[in-house]
Amino acid sequence: MNLTAYGNENIILNGNPKKTFFRATYNKYTNFGLQRFRIDYEGNRTLNYNSPTEFVFKIPRYAELLHDTYISIQLPDIWSPVKILDTPIQGNILIPYEFKWIEELGAHMIQNIEIFSGGVSLANYPGEYLSCLKERDFSAEKKELWNKMCGNIPELYDPANANGNINVYPNAMYIDQTGVEPSIRGRRLYIPLDAFFCNSSKFSIPLVALQYQEISIKITFNAVSNLYTINDVDNVVDATGLSYRMAPNPNNLDHQMWRFIQPPSDVKASLSSYNQTRNDWNADIHLVGTYIFLGQDERRVLAQNEHKILIKQVLSYDFLGVVGSKIIDIESKDLIVNYMWRFRRSDAFLRNEWSNYTNWAYNNVLPQNITSDLPFNEGVEISNPNTLHITGSMGEYSYNVKDIMLDMGIVMGGVYRENVMEAGVFNLVEKYNRTNGNAKDGLYCYNFCLTTGKDEIQPSGAMNVNRFPYVSFEFNTINAPIDKEGTQVDYICDENGNPIAFRKNVAKLNTYSYDLRVFEERYNVLIISSGRLGLLRAR
């Protein structure tokens, strides 16, 4: 019937056909082979508890090309004990630590990644960029896989609501000598490097053409104390034993990592019952690299010819303590593809809320929730048999305001490149057509290209900003709450010592401020010639 039901309308699809579903052609290709190799660090492969740890990996020449590469690290089993507090009135009170790894663990575990060769820095970007790149460019399915690889899963950051639990944390308590089941099972992370040579085989680094230089990858890890949170066991607010979540205090023995990487050996989990007080574990940090083997003819061509590879480089700029109306200058140059930026509360370090780009103290937790406590009506209590909930009083500051940025404009050479627009333009509209993903709230984008997909080989736009001394971001943020208790106040006195005025550091007027980080992606050309490597334009 399909063949007989044919008319002029079919010309749209079937007129002068160029394609058939019943015959296929293909292009022949040169033979190759893929193989993964483990790349080890020559030295101690453990992480420092209270300071960054640096690893430099020298890339061996196992094959002709280096393609996608991953950072591999083993997380330990976690036993989160329960502190038993003896009180004269209430008796024993159980206070749980409820250890949790931070969200986006794999990305925020890394402070910085640098790829260099012969003194030339090919790539230099913070680990946070990996998380932002995932948010901006990955589909929902790819994000789910990335989250599993990088440890951004409830089993690690919210065990109370994982593995079938519903708001029930799996605390670890000693029962007998057979051992204690961990609160959080250890697992191995595989963190994608996502450098320029990882996304397409066409951009792979031709090691065979680098006869006189070697590639090195330097990875700086954050301190372990920045990677987990616990219940504030020293300031319990109610009979549940729970309090606010906090970053561990490295000077407090109750907060040390060794409390959680070995099982408790008595019911009270007393400090004296632990066998060792080392805060490190066998992290077994190494790289996993995919190498490409080529045939003899293609190997000869790669080794003898000059190579020019168009790459994207990432630069980051930090502006600390911004509140209200501000203009910041970014020293951009060359061909800029896009900007990506976020604001974060300056007190995030108190809670290790590194991936929280909102005004809320805790990610996805409303500061002031609804309540069933009704106000009095002319001194008479209002009955509430149906347990209705109300929003409550706003007070002097609305802590429930979520978004930090209100609006922004982009200025180049004193001229508006983009007029001041509401934050939603950069938070929603810009992402709708220009990105493949659905970046979370608080991660803003502005593109000079048509699409930002990291797998896109063909450039789709950029802007040469060399005519301008700098690019300016003009923006407004919400106001942070005022610090009523005040900090240091300087009094201005006359010649007789009588106070006539006072002044206060503007940066300390608020209980916290906001830290702005801007990621810039720009084009550059990697040149490999005569066995050596360089960049067309220095960073």
Q: Language-model segments: which ranges?
A:
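Short, low-complexity Pro/Thr/Gly
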Residues: 1-539
